Structures are given as C-alpha cells and as structure tokens.
Regions:
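Macrodomain-like recognition of ADP-ribose-binding/processing modules
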Residues: 1-180
C-alpha cells in the first residue's frame, strides 16, 4: 500500500495542469479524505498562544494537517506546485494533499494574470482536500549564493505582509505560515 501511495503521489506531482475526469476526482478526494483522517487533523484554534502576543501561535508540525482558515504556501513563481516526485518541500506537500484541483486552479489564475507571480506578492485559492479553507500562495526569494543581496533580505518580509492582505481580500482569515 505504501509503495502504491508513493507511486500515486509521484504521478500527481509530475502531471501538468489538465482537466480531470469527475470519476477520478471522486476517487482522489475519497483517498485524500481517508489519508487526512488517518494522519489526524490539528485544530488551529486549540493551540495555545504565545506569552508575548495572544494573537500569535507557534507550532512545529505538518501544516497540511492544520485546520485553519488559511495556510500559506511558499510556492514557485508559476504557482503550480513542485513537480519533483515526492519532494520534501512544503509546496509539494500542499499541492499533493490538496489534490490535483489545486494545480488546475493555480494554472487558471496564472493564465488570467499572464505572467509569473512576483516575489513578495500573494494569491488565494480554495484548499480543496486540506483541512484548511484556503491556501495563500506566495513566492519567496531564490538565493543562489550564500550571501543574499539587500533586496533578497527584504523579500521574505514582503511575503509575510502580502499574505494577510491577500487573505483579507478573500475573507478576513487568520493565517498559518510556513517558513518562507
């Protein structure tokens, strides 16, 4: 079963955004729902706030298990998720466990936009099969050297500012951030 699930995840990861048969989506959604229940869901509202700010919660764990209004994905500039089979990045996990609908919706967003998503901006989509309601997609900096430029140092802050603004535009939703 583990090797079959790994094969399915690999195929989901490499598949380009193309329409899917309703029958396939029904089976995929049932599988992802069963997997979500097996892994367990963490209720974001039940996590204790930090001592410094009652609005802030720090949690180490799998963001794809978190029931929250919105989770933030450190995405690539195409917003299509990671295409590397079973890669360990957060982008791969979010796109895998949300289901293949997420890649399709992101592709529609990007086609309508007409260009790659700039670093430090954000877009909101449904979370589909994740326990959260929305996914906020933001693109962090790519630092090919060990020494980031001054602009690259500022870019994560832009992501952290743009994500709540994007969520507020969709709905005033509390956010769960991954590291960007």
């Amino acid at each position: 079963a583990f090797s079959q699930r790994r094969l399915l995840r690999s195929l989901m990861n490499v598949r380009p955004p193309m329409p899917l048969a309703p029958e396939f989506l029904k089976v995929q959604d049932a599988l992802l729902s069963a997997e979500r229940e097996e892994k367990g869901v963490v209720d974001g509202d039940a996590l204790p706030p930090t001592a410094g700010d009652p609005r802030l919660v720090l949690c180490q764990g799998d963001i794809t298990r978190l029931r929250a209004d919105a989770i933030v994905d450190a995405d690539n500039s195409a917003l299509l998720g990671c295409f590397a089979p079973c890669h360990g990045c957060i982008d791969n996990a979010i796109h895998t466990f949300a289901g293949m609908q997420l890649r399709l919706v992101c592709d529609e967003l990007m086609r309508a936009q007409g260009h790659d998503e700039p670093v430090g901006r954000a877009q909101v989509t449904s979370a589909f099969n994740l326990p959260s309601r929305f996914v906020v997609h933001t693109v962090g900096p790519q630092v090919p050297t060990r020494e980031p430029t001054a602009a690259q140092v500022e870019q994560p802050a832009s992501c952290y500012r743009a994500s709540p603004a994007a969520a507020a535009a969709a709905r005033d939703a509390p956010l769960a951030f991954c590291c960007i």
